[in-house]
Amino acid sequence: MLDKSRLRIAMQKSGRLSKESQQLLEQCGIKINLQQQRLLAFAENMPIDIMRVRDDDIPGLVMDDVVDLGIIGENVLEEELLTRRAQGEDPRYFTLRQLDFGGCRLSIALLLDTPWTGPECLRGKRIATSYPHLLKQYLDKLDITFKSCLLNGSVEVAPRAGLADAICDLVSTGATLEANGLREAEVIYRSKACLIQRDGELSVAKQSLVDKLLIRIQGVIQARESKYIMMHAPTERLDDIISLLTGAEQPTILPLAGDQHRVAMHMVSSETLFWETMENLKALGASSILVLPIEKMME
């Protein structure tokens, strides 16, 4: 049984978000001993308990106050929200922040030889999906009537099996659609992972831990999006070089021993550095250019 004095976090046991959710918590300094068959795990260095469950159970666990936090895909969260509202409930929770993984899209897909000129082609058609409420919300806005075929897995086989005229399913790379002779026709919802919290006041100790966790998550995400850059640069081209790079702060400029015309420049850049950027730096006279990953970052 979970100790209610400890912060309770629900995450996906296996699947699309499981590995990256675990990595995020570990990069935030939470030491967790996860065992494959165990649904509960306990942090060794913080008062945090982890509940590992199916992804579509996570929103309900948060909304029903079983856990304090949940890491969940926005698509699953929105579907649960719409489901509960359709049942006359008033689901309560709030989103702490979007995360930088789990990107996908919910799309309409058709057999390769099915004509498509727009969503109007779906009028009166039978559509197989695991997300009936998101699909209905999208087509209701367009005033398009359709028939829904609810499937909780293997949605891609529905058109060839004669179960549906089209599908509405998650797409990441499109490889699964291609393997089943389908093509993506229309994106109806874009999703990433997010961190949600139950409604209601937390204890002072729990809230303090949540605040600390949010700062660490921000540091992890910012570090992923940033690079540490070192180079030797001619003093007369410093302004031009700095203008090429978006930095978290002004660069550090250090003198080079025995060279009055060049300096060492260190900076954190919040932009992805492509080869073209490095070639432009070299064209401005920079040399010994190093681009390094950042593990952790706090401003």
From Swiss-Prot:
It is an enzyme of class 2 (transferase). Its EC number is 2.4.2.17. It is found in: Cytoplasm. Keywords: Amino-acid biosynthesis, ATP-binding, Cytoplasm, Glycosyltransferase, Histidine biosynthesis, Magnesium, Metal-binding, Nucleotide-binding, Transferase. Transmembrane segments: none annotated. It holds the Pfam family HisG. Feedback inhibited by histidine. GO terms for molecular function: ATP binding; ATP phosphoribosyltransferase activity; magnesium ion binding. GO terms for biological process: L-histidine biosynthetic process. The keyword Transmembrane helix does not apply. Pathway: Amino-acid biosynthesis; L-histidine biosynthesis; L-histidine from 5-phospho-alpha-D-ribose 1-diphosphate: step 1/9. Its cofactor is Mg(2+). It catalyses: 1-(5-phospho-beta-D-ribosyl)-ATP + diphosphate = 5-phospho-alpha-D-ribose 1-diphosphate + ATP. One of its GO terms (cellular component) is cytoplasm. Its main location: cytoplasm. Belongs to the ATP phosphoribosyltransferase family. Long subfamily. NCBIfam families: hisG, HisG_C-term. Equilibrium between an active dimeric form, an inactive hexameric form and higher aggregates. Interconversion between the various forms is largely reversible and is influenced by the natural substrates and inhibitors of the enzyme. Catalyzes the condensation of ATP and 5-phosphoribose 1-diphosphate to form N'-(5'-phosphoribosyl)-ATP (PR-ATP). Has a crucial role in the pathway because the rate of histidine biosynthesis seems to be controlled primarily by regulation of HisG enzymatic activity. This is ATP phosphoribosyltransferase. It comes from Sodalis glossinidius (strain morsitans).
